[in-house]
A protein has these predicted regions:
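Catalytic, metal-anchored helix/loop core of enzyme active sites in primary metabolism
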Residues: 1-305
């Protein structure tokens, strides 16, 4: 999740949002600039080596600054915090997710590793209204469940674009470059998630995330390649009905949904024009070529933390 996307909303939505605290690994200059722009009074940095960064001297005296993983997690306990958007990368985000829910705050979760690594620990603390997924696919599934009885869902259809290497053979994949892997056809993401998306590893992690979020088995989740990236995911019900969430591929939409729920705010994202779509394709993933997805499915079936 791009922090700049998130911070569009306090300016765009009058009196709805206030930035109370910000945390990052080591992006000191950026955090100081945002703290000054939004009047944020609490900062934390996971990397303790930035303690002496010159930019910190620009902060007002009433701004508290902490360093280390404990300082980042402590932000979730602040009295004036209502919702925590956790977009930390990797398993480092698990503690913030756990502490947020333990403190009774709303967790807007963009850190899938929290559930992949520790879903059995996190989910008992969550309710339907306190854990809101920010990943576009899981936000879509969440919205497809609204107004339904969960036990009447038959399966989840989890979509993916197929990445830049869709249709390639193993031999062809042995020749690809890092630059090609970083050229995702649909989403603008950080390098780690972009590479994981190219190998379909990220989609495998999303299956495990969905298992925990929606309390379903691995084999009740079908991954389907959808190159147009218009259908963000679907839920099929026992009566044969299928609810799908469609829209443009813009992360601002699921971010805003998590921040505004149970309401919907007007979005800066473009609106979808169905007349410009010649077709919507849905294909089986190549599990023999993209072994990362296969391994993730096996891990999901095995369970555990």
């Amino acid at each position: 999740v791009d922090l700049q996307m998130v911070l569009e909303y306090p300016d765009a939505v009058d009196d709805e949002l206030e930035v109370v605290a910000l945390a990052a690994g080591r992006r000191v200059d950026e955090m100081v600039r945002y703290a000054q722009e939004f009047g944020c009074k609490h900062l934390a940095f996971g990397d303790e080596t930035v303690r002496d960064a010159p930019a910190l001297a620009q902060l007002d005296d009433d701004v508290s600054v902490g360093f280390g993983a404990a300082a980042v997690a402590a932000l979730t306990q602040l009295d004036d915090v209502d919702i925590v958007l956790n977009a930390l990368s990797g398993e480092a985000g698990m503690r913030a997710s756990y502490d947020t829910l333990k403190a009774g705050r709303i967790l807007a979760l963009a850190n899938k590793e929290s559930l992949v690594v520790g879903g059995d620990l996190i989910m008992p603390l969550a309710t339907h209204d306190t854990l809101l997924p920010v990943d576009s696919e899981h936000s879509a599934i969440y919205q497809c469940y609204l107004g339904e009885f969960a036990n009447e869902a038959l399966r989840i259809w989890l979509t993916c674009s197929g990445g830049p290497f869709r249709g390639m053979t193993r031999d062809e994949l042995s020749q690809v470059t890092a630059a090609q892997a970083l050229a995702h056809p649909t989403w603008n993401m950080g390098p780690k998630i972009t590479v994981d998306s190219a190998t379909l590893m990220n989609k495998g992690l999303e299956v495990i995330e969905a298992q925990h979020l929606f309390d379903v088995k691995t084999d009740d989740i079908r991954v389907v390649v959808h190159p147009q990236s218009c259908v963000h995911s679907m839920v099929e019900y026992v009566d044969g009905s299928v609810k799908a969430h469609l829209g443009v591929a813009d992360m601002r939409i699921p971010i805003q949904f998590a921040l505004s729920y149970p309401h919907r705010w007007e979005s800066p994202a473009a609106q979808v024009d169905f007349t410009q779509m010649a077709s919507l394709e849905f294909l089986d993933p190549d599990l023999d070529t993209f072994r990362c997805l296969t391994l993730a499915l096996e891990a999901g079936r095995a369970g555990g933390t």
